[in-house]
Each structure stands twice: as structure tokens, then as C-alpha cells.
Amino acid sequence: EAAGLLAFPRT
């Protein structure tokens, strides 16, 4: 998810 990447970058 685009917004999710900014909030918590999943590795």
C-alpha cells in the first residue's frame, strides 16, 4: 500500500 509504505516501510 502506498500510504502504508510511508507510515511503516515493510522490508
Swiss-Prot record:
Give the GO biological process terms: neuropeptide signaling pathway
Q: Which domain of life is it from?
A: Eukaryota
Q: Which UniProt keywords apply?
A: Amidation, Neuropeptide, Secreted
Q: Which residues carry this modification: Threonine amide?
A: T11
Q: State the protein's purpose.
A: Mediates visceral muscle contractile activity (myotropic activity).
Q: Where in the cell is it found?
A: Secreted
**Signal sequence, start to end:** none
Question: Can you name a GO cellular component term?
Answer: extracellular region
Q: What is this protein called?
A: CAPA-Periviscerokinin-1
- Keyword match rRNA processing: no
By sequence similarity, the record places it as follows: Belongs to the periviscerokinin family.
